[in-house]
Amino acid sequence: LILPFNPRKASGFREGSLQMAPRVKLRLLEGTYGVARLSADASIPAWADGTGFLSISRTDDELSVVCRQERIPHDVKADTGWNCLKLQGPFAFDETGIVLSVIEPLSTNDIGIFVVSTFDGDHLLVKSKDLEKTFELLANAGHSCI
Protein backbone atom coordinates (compact mmCIF):
# COMPACT_ATOMS: atom_id res chain seq x y z
CA LEU A 1 0.00 0.00 0.00
CA ILE A 2 1.45 3.35 -1.03
CA LEU A 3 -0.17 6.47 0.32
CA PRO A 4 0.29 9.79 -1.47
CA PHE A 5 2.26 12.45 0.41
CA ASN A 6 0.50 15.78 0.63
CA PRO A 7 3.08 18.45 1.54
CA ARG A 8 0.35 21.07 2.01
CA LYS A 9 -1.19 19.00 4.79
CA ALA A 10 2.17 18.05 6.33
CA SER A 11 3.28 21.66 6.50
CA GLY A 12 0.12 22.79 8.26
CA PHE A 13 -1.40 24.52 5.20
CA ARG A 14 -5.10 25.17 5.67
CA GLU A 15 -7.44 25.12 2.70
CA GLY A 16 -8.86 28.55 1.94
CA SER A 17 -6.00 30.24 3.73
CA LEU A 18 -2.39 31.08 3.10
CA GLN A 19 -1.56 30.71 6.79
CA MET A 20 0.79 28.08 8.07
CA ALA A 21 0.24 26.15 11.29
CA PRO A 22 -0.11 28.34 14.38
CA ARG A 23 3.12 29.71 15.73
CA VAL A 24 4.18 27.81 18.79
CA LYS A 25 5.43 28.96 22.18
CA LEU A 26 8.15 26.75 23.60
CA ARG A 27 9.31 26.70 27.21
CA LEU A 28 12.84 25.66 28.11
CA LEU A 29 12.69 23.18 30.98
CA GLU A 30 15.28 23.35 33.74
CA GLY A 31 18.19 20.97 33.72
CA THR A 32 20.09 18.88 31.24
CA TYR A 33 18.66 15.59 30.03
CA GLY A 34 19.92 12.21 28.95
CA VAL A 35 18.50 9.33 26.96
CA ALA A 36 19.35 6.00 28.58
CA ARG A 37 19.12 2.60 26.90
CA LEU A 38 18.44 -0.53 28.91
CA SER A 39 17.71 -4.07 27.77
CA ALA A 40 14.18 -4.78 26.58
CA ASP A 41 13.47 -7.01 29.58
CA ALA A 42 14.82 -4.57 32.19
CA SER A 43 12.56 -3.36 34.97
CA ILE A 44 11.67 0.32 35.02
CA PRO A 45 14.52 1.78 37.10
CA ALA A 46 13.78 3.63 40.33
CA TRP A 47 16.56 6.13 39.52
CA ALA A 48 14.53 7.52 36.60
CA ASP A 49 11.87 9.11 38.81
CA GLY A 50 12.25 12.66 40.07
CA THR A 51 11.81 16.28 39.07
CA GLY A 52 11.67 17.41 35.47
CA PHE A 53 10.47 15.73 32.32
CA LEU A 54 10.46 11.93 32.30
CA SER A 55 9.56 9.55 29.48
CA ILE A 56 9.85 5.78 29.51
CA SER A 57 9.32 3.71 26.36
CA ARG A 58 9.62 -0.03 25.87
CA THR A 59 9.95 -1.80 22.52
CA ASP A 60 10.93 -5.33 21.55
CA ASP A 61 14.53 -4.07 21.35
CA GLU A 62 15.02 -1.81 24.35
CA LEU A 63 13.77 0.18 27.32
CA SER A 64 14.50 3.88 26.81
CA VAL A 65 14.44 6.41 29.61
CA VAL A 66 14.56 10.17 29.08
CA CYS A 67 15.21 12.01 32.33
CA ARG A 68 17.49 14.56 33.98
CA GLN A 69 20.99 13.32 33.19
CA GLU A 70 22.28 13.53 36.76
CA ARG A 71 19.94 10.66 37.69
CA ILE A 72 21.38 8.25 35.10
CA PRO A 73 24.01 5.96 36.68
CA HIS A 74 27.46 6.07 35.07
CA ASP A 75 27.34 2.37 34.18
CA VAL A 76 24.18 2.79 32.06
CA LYS A 77 24.52 3.37 28.32
CA ALA A 78 23.26 6.90 27.69
CA ASP A 79 23.47 9.89 25.38
CA THR A 80 23.60 13.00 27.56
CA GLY A 81 23.80 16.75 27.05
CA TRP A 82 20.25 17.44 25.86
CA ASN A 83 18.01 20.40 26.67
CA CYS A 84 14.24 19.98 26.67
CA LEU A 85 11.80 22.46 25.15
CA LYS A 86 8.10 21.92 25.86
CA LEU A 87 5.69 22.97 23.13
CA GLN A 88 3.06 24.92 25.04
CA GLY A 89 -0.19 23.10 24.23
CA PRO A 90 -2.35 21.25 24.59
CA PHE A 91 -2.89 20.53 20.91
CA ALA A 92 -5.73 18.43 19.52
CA PHE A 93 -4.72 15.01 18.26
CA ASP A 94 -6.03 15.88 14.79
CA GLU A 95 -4.22 19.23 14.61
CA THR A 96 -1.65 18.84 11.86
CA GLY A 97 1.65 20.53 11.18
CA ILE A 98 2.43 21.65 14.74
CA VAL A 99 5.53 19.53 15.34
CA LEU A 100 6.64 19.85 11.71
CA SER A 101 6.56 23.66 11.92
CA VAL A 102 9.00 23.46 14.84
CA ILE A 103 11.36 20.74 13.64
CA GLU A 104 11.59 21.78 9.99
CA PRO A 105 13.74 24.90 10.53
CA LEU A 106 16.02 22.88 12.82
CA SER A 107 16.47 19.80 10.67
CA THR A 108 17.11 21.86 7.53
CA ASN A 109 19.93 23.59 9.44
CA ASP A 110 21.58 20.38 10.68
CA ILE A 111 20.30 20.60 14.27
CA GLY A 112 19.79 17.09 15.63
CA ILE A 113 16.48 16.66 17.44
CA PHE A 114 14.60 14.13 19.49
CA VAL A 115 10.82 14.53 19.93
CA VAL A 116 8.72 12.89 22.62
CA SER A 117 4.94 13.22 22.55
CA THR A 118 2.62 12.92 25.54
CA PHE A 119 -1.16 13.05 25.80
CA ASP A 120 -1.23 16.83 26.22
CA GLY A 121 1.83 17.95 24.34
CA ASP A 122 5.17 17.51 22.73
CA HIS A 123 8.72 17.86 24.00
CA LEU A 124 11.64 18.71 21.77
CA LEU A 125 15.13 17.75 22.88
CA VAL A 126 18.16 19.42 21.31
CA LYS A 127 21.82 19.11 22.22
CA SER A 128 22.99 21.78 24.66
CA LYS A 129 25.68 22.88 22.20
CA ASP A 130 22.90 23.69 19.68
CA LEU A 131 20.56 25.53 22.06
CA GLU A 132 21.49 29.11 21.11
CA LYS A 133 21.21 28.33 17.38
CA THR A 134 17.89 26.55 18.05
CA PHE A 135 16.44 29.67 19.68
CA GLU A 136 17.58 31.78 16.73
CA LEU A 137 16.13 29.42 14.11
CA LEU A 138 12.82 29.06 15.95
CA ALA A 139 12.47 32.84 16.31
CA ASN A 140 13.20 33.29 12.59
CA ALA A 141 10.41 30.77 11.87
CA GLY A 142 7.94 32.81 13.95
CA HIS A 143 7.99 30.74 17.12
CA SER A 144 8.78 32.09 20.58
CA CYS A 145 10.80 30.62 23.42
CA ILE A 146 9.74 31.60 26.92
Predicted ranges, named:
Residues 2-4, 87, 124, 132:
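Generic hydrophobic-segment detector
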